């Protein structure tokens, strides 16, 4: 994108969304492909096998990922969004990344594909003190989540929120959806009540 902007001397035409200049978020891919089997995702392991003929994810070397972040941080005041859960390739991959990125002070958005415990969040926060977190359980209802390919519990979601808040997360985004497999109107409305419970507990 940077080359194209310089070549054409035109930044606005390459802006990824309206008002991007006010919030110049940039992304860095941790991997091509995925280990997860989320039924609604076009980038799932199933989709990778059947659409891209990719049998397993190809992970960016963590040192290169850290280098990308530093380069992006030098160009933009906005956050860098690390697309993909750093733990997909295992904890050693995540720790190599944390060592390589140590000292980076810019805003970073990380995402979880499954719950994270306090120990992991302490390692992450030590390396990335200015971090934002995103987690998409999609439903409060474990039955609906299982039908969408997510097998963790509500306790796991709540442990993740607590661990992030206790380690200084700047913002925690939790995403829920409607129109999911096995989801009823009643279940969707119960998700709203679950959100109220979370706000009462963690706000």
Residue ranges and their predicted role:
Residues 182-196:
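Catalytic cores of alpha/beta
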Residues 1-4:
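Glycine-rich beta-alpha loop elements in corrinoid/cobalamin-binding modules
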Residues 6-170, 178:
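Radical SAM [4Fe-4S] cluster-binding motif and immediate context
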Residues 127-135, 194-203:
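Structural recognition of alpha->loop->beta junctions
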Residues 175:
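Metabolite-binding pocket within alpha/beta catalytic cores that recognizes anionic/polar moieties
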């Amino acid at each position: 994108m940077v080359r194209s902007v310089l070549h054409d001397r035109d930044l606005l035409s390459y802006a990824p969304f309206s008002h991007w200049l006010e919030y110049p978020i940039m992304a860095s891919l941790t991997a091509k492909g995925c280990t997860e089997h989320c039924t609604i995702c076009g980038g799932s392991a199933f989709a990778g096998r059947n659409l891209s003929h990719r049998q397993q994810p190809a992970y960016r070397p963590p040192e290169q990922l850290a280098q990308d972040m530093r380069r992006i941080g030098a160009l933009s005041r906005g956050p860098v969004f690390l697309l993909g859960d750093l733990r997909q390739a295992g904890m050693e991959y995540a720790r190599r990344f944390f060592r390589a990125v140590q000292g980076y002070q810019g805003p970073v958005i990380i995402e979880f594909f499954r719950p994270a415990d306090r120990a992991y969040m302490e390692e992450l926060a030590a390396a990335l003190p200015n971090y934002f977190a995103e987690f998409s359980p999609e439903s409060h209802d474990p039955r609906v989540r299982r039908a969408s390919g997510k097998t963790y519990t509500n306790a796991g979601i709540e442990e993740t929120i607590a661990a992030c808040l206790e380690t200084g997360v700047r913002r925690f985004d939790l995403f829920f959806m409607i129109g999911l497999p096995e989801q009823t109107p009643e279940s969707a409305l119960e998700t709203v009540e679950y959100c109220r419970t979370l706000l009462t507990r963690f706000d």
